UniProtKB/Swiss-Prot annotation:
This is Argininosuccinate lyase. Pathway: Amino-acid biosynthesis; L-arginine biosynthesis; L-arginine from L-ornithine and carbamoyl phosphate: step 3/3. It is an enzyme of class 4 (lyase). The gene is argH. Its main location: cytoplasm. PANTHER family: ARGININOSUCCINATE LYASE. It comes from the Bacteria. It comes from Mycobacterium tuberculosis (strain CDC 1551 / Oshkosh). GO terms for cellular component: cytosol.
């Protein structure tokens, strides 16, 4: 049987919790990462108590000195949680009381509950964590942009349903992976608007009667505002769910990029060669070079999706306000951040180190009659209704299949027999270069448009980098 010695809540209990309850309740094995934020918030809370007339100058200075000493010991590892500590809050209060005594150390708890405290600390930690993740995402975007810039004219088969569809620029395809990641960064910027609301001053759920100033502590801790509703402030974890969604979405976007790399590096495709430093071998097959980073990215995406789903399931049926279920809110989010901090540098390095086999991609670009749409659209430009043009292009594909040749290898007579509008001038678009150049619309794969897109992505990345600084 445990005791209530050092507990934050034991006064009305005749004895301590059972060993099983103490083990179940313990959270220092994951919430200790909040310790620096807890100490920062305690400094700010000390000042709020002083301004409210609840501490003398001597008491204020004593608490601040004790907190500074404790912070140093936490930072260098000389102070940490004991097996008897329930959570980060009780561990740090024990450390503070050891330094300043129970009378002074016990004054810091006035006007705050673990309910508003942990909600604030979680927001503080998460606002920093999303910025670390964002830096890693920007590195992947940068690697994609650099590869796109290095291959401005390389042409590859564009695919739908994993079937050859139309020729596109390799740079266009690479930037198609950068755009979703930039949207993820926009989500992080937008998320911070809602995360930057301080629950401090809400107490357990009803606020405080001690004349404290929630706006002052919000400003001291870098929040943009104090919460408008104390019940909501202590109970809400939509900010955590929103972050978990953004993390899962980043993982999904990385997984789609990883899938392309896995397929492209296969013998059958042969689009890319993996660098030795960013691939692994086989314990039995000497010839293997495996895309493990990409495969782990694909696998970890499921883990982050699971973290999001688990958190939402935890939140879905809780009555207001705080419930102990919310102890389960942090581990999935902490894990998602940890996995992305492992994965993002590896993906950035993998992308940057890829060697593209541009000749093979160019050779495969017209395979599968990928120029058929160009033929149909050329006829449309000659005034042929698209339905008729589509049928003529299909007939041309059938004729080429029967001969076992590409569309560009059909003779002038064969083309004319299919449609009198198919004059020799159609050959201008029956090349992969002509095909990509013809798609000169906004967002298209023409070289000039892709160059514009590359510049825009660079500008967007710089804008986001500035927005994420605080």
């Amino acid at each position: 049987m445990s005791t209530n010695e050092g507990s934050l809540w034991g006064g009305r209990f005749a004895g301590g919790p059972s060993d099983a309850l103490a083990a179940l309740s313990k959270s220092t094995h994951f919430d200790w990462v909040l310790a620096p934020y807890d100490l920062t918030a305690s400094r700010a809370h000390t000042m709020v108590l002083f301004r409210a007339g609840l501490l003398t100058e001597e008491q204020r200075d004593g608490l601040l000195a004790g907190l500074d000493s404790l912070a140093q010991d936490v930072a260098d590892g000389s102070f940490g949680p004991l097996v008897t500590d329930e959570d980060v809050h009780s561990a740090l209060e024990r450390g503070l009381i050891d330094r300043v005594g129970p009378d002074l150390g016990g004054r810091l708890r006035a006007g705050r509950s673990r309910n508003d405290q942990v909600a604030a600390l979680f927001r503080m930690w998460l606002r920093d964590a999303v910025r670390r993740v964002a830096t890693g995402v920007l590195d992947v975007v940068g690697a994609l942009a650099e590869q796109a810039a290095a291959h401005p004219s390389a042409i590859m088969p564009g695919k739908t349903h994993l079937q050859s569809a139309q020729p596109i620029l390799l740079a266009h395809h690479l930037l198609a992976h950068a755009h979703p990641l930039l949207r993820d960064l926009d989500r992080i910027v937008d998320f911070d608007k809602r995360a930057a609301v301080s629950p401090y001053g809400s107490g357990a759920l009803a606020g405080s009667s001690l004349g404290l100033d929630p706006d002052a502590i919000a400003a001291d801790l870098g929040f943009s505002a104090a919460a408008d509703n104390s019940v909501d402030a202590t109970a809400a974890r939509d900010f955590a769910a929103e972050a978990a969604f953004v993390f899962a979405m980043i993982a999904v976007d990385l997984s789609r990029l990883a899938e392309d790399i896995i397929v492209w590096s296969s013998t059958e495709f042969g689009y890319v060669t993996l660098h030795d430093s960013w691939s692994t071998g086989s314990s039995i097959m000497p010839q293997k070079k495996n895309p493990d980073i990409a495969e782990l990215a694909r696998g970890k995406s499921g883990r982050l999706i699971g973290n999001l789903a688990g958190l939402l399931a935890t939140l879905k049926a809780q009555p207001l306000a705080y419930n102990r279920d919310l102890q389960e809110d942090k581990e999935p989010v902490f894990d998602s951040v940890a996995q992305l901090e492992l994965l993002l540098p590896a993906m950035a390095g993998l992308v940057a180190s890829l060697t593209f086999n541009v000749q093979r991609m160019a050779e495969l670009a017209p395979a599968g009659y990928t120029l058929a749409t160009d033929l149909a659209e050329w006829l449309v430009r000659q005034g042929v209704p698209f339905r008729s043009a589509h049928e003529a292009a299909g007939a041309a594909v059938r004729a080429a299949e029967q001969r076992g040749v590409g569309l560009q290898e059909l003779t002038d007579d064969e083309l004319a027999a299919i449609s009198p509008e198919l004059t020799p001038q159609v050959r201008e678009v029956l090349t992969i270069e002509g095909s990509v150049s013809a798609r000169d619309c906004r967002g298209g794969t023409a070289p000039g448009r892709v160059a514009e897109q590359l510049n825009a992505i660079g500008e967007a990345a710089e804008r986001l980098r500035r927005q994420l600084v605080r």
